[in-house]
């Protein structure tokens, strides 16, 4: 069988240039597909690659590709470069709920360091707050953000992860494991839904399940 490699001189030249010119602790951010190339030819760390998709990197990088808010994208990249997914993981260790931890993470990303500190002190102590802030607001290493033409055809994939709605996922988990009464109570207490709104959603989900 004939085999045409995906790597080419353009890629090698670009990545070799990064290897020659980038700071030793520089990080390359991109979609995961070519992460192993980046590590080999550029000899730098990457956000994630084919061997490191066990956390939420796909959501955060997907979001940077999707968002029209440049400040949000920069804040996400700083967070990833400062500590990978440790910021959200530490918040999760406090609230024990993925939807809540991601929601808080997005809120922190939109705040100044001083305001973020105040927000974190609502849920944890001073020393833990200081640790978490470092994962959001360290002096980040040099950052290379790589996009390539093939990513246009892959947009359905990174957009799927980047636009993942954690609240909807949580609602579906409640639906799968509860009857209508428990479902409604969960949405009221956890997500501030009204009775009628929660009941309507339950029966909409039931109809979808039946249609399948």
Show where each model-derived region lies.
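Extracytoplasmic
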Residues: 1-212
């Amino acid at each position: 069988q004939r085999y045409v490699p995906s790597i080419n001189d353009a890629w090698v030249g670009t990545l070799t240039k990064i290897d020659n010119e980038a700071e030793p602790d520089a990080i390359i951010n991109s979609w995961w597909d070519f992460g192993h190339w980046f590590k080999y030819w550029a000899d730098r760390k990457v956000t994630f690659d084919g061997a490191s998709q066990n956390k939420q990197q796909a959501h955060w990088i997907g979001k940077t590709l999707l968002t029209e808010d440049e400040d949000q994208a920069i804040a996400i990249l700083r967070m990833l470069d400062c500590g990978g997914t440790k910021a959200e993981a530490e918040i999760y260790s406090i609230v024990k709920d993925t939807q809540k931890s991601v929601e808080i993470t997005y809120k922190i990303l939109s705040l100044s360091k001083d305001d973020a500190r105040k927000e974190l002190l609502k849920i944890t102590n001073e020393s833990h707050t200081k640790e978490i802030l470092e994962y959001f607001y360290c002096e980040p290493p040099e950052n290379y953000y790589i996009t390539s033409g093939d990513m246009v055809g892959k947009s359905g994939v990174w957009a799927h992860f980047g636009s993942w709605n954690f609240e909807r996922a949580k609602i579906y988990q409640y639906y799968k494991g509860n009857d209508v009464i428990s479902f409604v109570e969960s949405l009221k207490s956890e997500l501030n839904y009204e009775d009628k709104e929660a009941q309507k959603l339950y029966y909409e989900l039931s109809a979808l399940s039946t249609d399948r």
